[in-house]
Amino acid sequence: MNISNINNDIYLGGLGNHSTEEIKNFLIDNNIKCIITIWNFNKLNIKKLNINVKDYMYIHAYDLTNEIIIDYFDITNKFIINKIKEGKKVLIHCYAGISRSASIVINYFMNKYNINYDEAEKIVSKKRNIKPNIFFILQLKFYNSYKNINIIYLIILFAIRYTLK
């Protein structure tokens, strides 16, 4: 299977050339109960994979340099965090497991560890060959900067409010 274990809870891969039976066997063998699909094909047949509808997220996205994926960063992070809290492993996949799904996993690690793109990319690339397209990289860097700007803004507001008391 074209899937890599990134850490105890996160698997990253490409399912483009695998049958439903191969996928099902891999999920069973690795005790994976949750899936995020991010590609421009049909949803996976989760009934045949024995995946609960609440444990499946589908995002229709192309691997193109004009595709907007930043809108999905918050919801995928929440999904992954919640499923891990439930004690479930999560597979994040696209067609090849190199760009779209890798971007989702990089974003997860950026948020989990409060690190920048380069640090998160290193964590993921140690376990799997990845190459997010340049526009996905720009979105990841922007998202991380924007998130940090909001934190700085809140700290300044708190400091001003505290000073005025």
Curated annotation (Swiss-Prot):
UniProt entry keywords in alphabetical sequence: Hydrolase, Protein phosphatase
Single GO MF annotation: MAP kinase tyrosine phosphatase activity
Active site: 94
Pfam families with a match to the protein in the record: DSPc (PF00782)
Keyword Methyltransferase annotated: no
A GO biological-process term: negative regulation of MAPK cascade
InterPro entries per record: Dual-sp_phosphatase_cat-dom (IPR000340), Prot-tyrosine_phosphatase-like (IPR029021), Tyr_Pase_AS (IPR016130), Tyr_Pase_dom (IPR000387), TYR_PHOSPHATASE_DUAL_dom (IPR020422)
Entry EC no(s): 3.1.3.48
CDD domains from the UniProt entry: DSP (cd14498)
SUPFAM superfamilies, A to Z: (Phosphotyrosine protein) phosphatases II
Reactions that this protein is recorded to catalyse: O-phospho-L-tyrosyl-[protein] + H2O = L-tyrosyl-[protein] + phosphate
Residues in Tyrosine-protein phosphatase domain copies: 2-149
PROSITE patterns: TYR_PHOSPHATASE_1, TYR_PHOSPHATASE_2, TYR_PHOSPHATASE_DUAL
Family to which this protein belongs: Belongs to the protein-tyrosine phosphatase family. Non-receptor class dual specificity subfamily.
Record's protein name: Putative tyrosine-protein phosphatase AMV078
